[in-house]
Amino acid sequence: MANIVVSGEQLQEAFREVAAMVDSTVGATAGPRGNTIGISKPYGGPEVTKDGYKVMKGIKPEKPLHSAIVSTIAQSASQCNDKVGDGTTTCSILTSNMIMEASKSIAAGNDRICIKNGIQKAKDVILKEITSMSRTISLEKMDEVAQVAIISANGDKDIGNSIADAVKKVGKEGVITVEESKGSKELEVELTTGMQFDRGYLSPYFVTNNEKMSVELDDPYLLITEKKLNIIQPLLPILEAIFKSGKPLFIIAEDVEGEALSTLVINKLRGLKVAAVKAPGFGDRRKEMLEDIAALTGAKYVIKDELGIKMEDLTLEDLGTAKNVKITKDNTTIVSEDSDCDKQNRVNARINQIKSQIETSTSDYDKEKLRERLAKLSGGVAVLKVGGATEVEVKERRDRVEDALHATRAAIEEGIVPGGGVALLYAASALDKLKASSDEEQIGINIVKKVLSAPIKRLVKNAGLESAVIIDYLIKQNDKELIYNVEAMNYANASTAGVIDPAKVVRIAFETAVSVASALITTESMIVDLPNKEENASSPMGAGAMGGMGGF
């Protein structure tokens, strides 16, 4: 396919056009008074959503150059979503506004590298300021936990209170998962037996939920082994039995590679529900953790050389089972069945054994690792069961529950800051003392200072108000706890009004926006594919769309 190189003012103009499109479309969803956006689908009616991340992914311009720029800007929202699971709308607003302002300065003849350096200098100052503004969230104050979740869930108090209830049940380090409820229309919290460990899927081809890039297995069998699996022959008998059963298979091994991994992937693509992860931990600790998982899931054996049991002799009765397993690129969560007495007895026996080891151990390090294992086995898993009247309602509500859960975890991890966009607005004042090494570097610093007010401007605009007056009043009061509550239409104390944001979400949104915007700011040219003649002839615009490169 032929392509063309676009640079100079034509490229800068395209940057500004696309950035303005993203700002107006994604920004329209921001805040409690944000709007919904309809996204057309290849089949059925359009999806109507207020999720900024979905809207960002739904923007697909016709012009190849614009499409390439949108894809690059979308990386900011995607990275923000991957890192913290929330803040994608704020990130998109910051990214697009930074690109617009920088592009104007570059078009005026200023040096792009100096501008980028100024932006990077400002970034370091702002990140420190956000950290200094944050305060720890207390798990004793469940109303604060609930409020963070309510804001992220677009004001849904039921979601906020349910997440606070789940956090209360499992604690700060506890595991909370989300699943769709069968039969119920309500949002329920259920405490069940389970475990989470920090190992992700060994191949993205195992993914069952492409939108969330996760593996979700219901009622799977579990094969647990200390061995490294690199040939498929020993696995064939159990794979055949799994295929006949119609249930998924989840493999935990030292590693799965070579022929074994490629064969599992091929069978997954052909319809077999299968996934594999590396075993958690290292050395003797890994062996003990695998025994913990075997107890939790009811597996008869952890397959190892010392047992003398061959993999090809395994039957389904030898494997473990679970209610469900969810795997992301970083973590695995196993939810067991509470009704299984044998499993519960084995888990209790392991818990008592670990407690005895803690009492007799003389090593502080060993005690710490034993306590970690104890917490994983005894802490349980809180399951948020999402119900609704229709499948569409359940899906939309589940998305909001997951966003709110991510925000709550971020708040517990790094604390909270005043919400409503004021954290970034107030942080901008720290740039007044920052000295640039050149006038063009100062332009970069000034761009960041201006862009930091973009989120609150958009929130106020969506409420139908004039932002200049509100921002001027907030700054003059010199009170960093003062916010403008766009829902109640009044000035208020952030904590009293419950308008708070997780510091981690604000930090990641800003940091990611700077990273992606800087990449585009320093882009001199873009190489884009020309549409082929067949596509062009069949388009409504015909060949005329290419005239003067207007098709870009």
UniProtKB/Swiss-Prot annotation:
Keywords of this entry: ATP-binding, Chaperone, Cytoplasm, Isomerase, Nucleotide-binding
Top-level EC class: isomerase
GO MF term (any one): ATP binding
E.C. designation(s): 5.6.1.7
Top-level division of the source organism's lineage: Bacteria
Coiled coil start-end: none
Any one cellular-component term (Gene Ontology): cytoplasm
Principal location class: cytoplasm
Gene Ontology process terms (BP): protein refolding
Location in or out of the cell: Cytoplasm
PANTHER family attached to this UniProt entry: 60 KDA HEAT SHOCK PROTEIN, MITOCHONDRIAL
Family: Belongs to the chaperonin (HSP60) family.
Purpose: Together with its co-chaperonin GroES, plays an essential role in assisting protein folding. The GroEL-GroES system forms a nano-cage that allows encapsulation of the non-native substrate proteins and provides a physical environment optimized to promote and accelerate protein folding.
Record's subunit section: Forms a cylinder of 14 subunits composed of two heptameric rings stacked back-to-back. Interacts with the co-chaperonin GroES.
Protein name from the UniProt record: Chaperonin GroEL
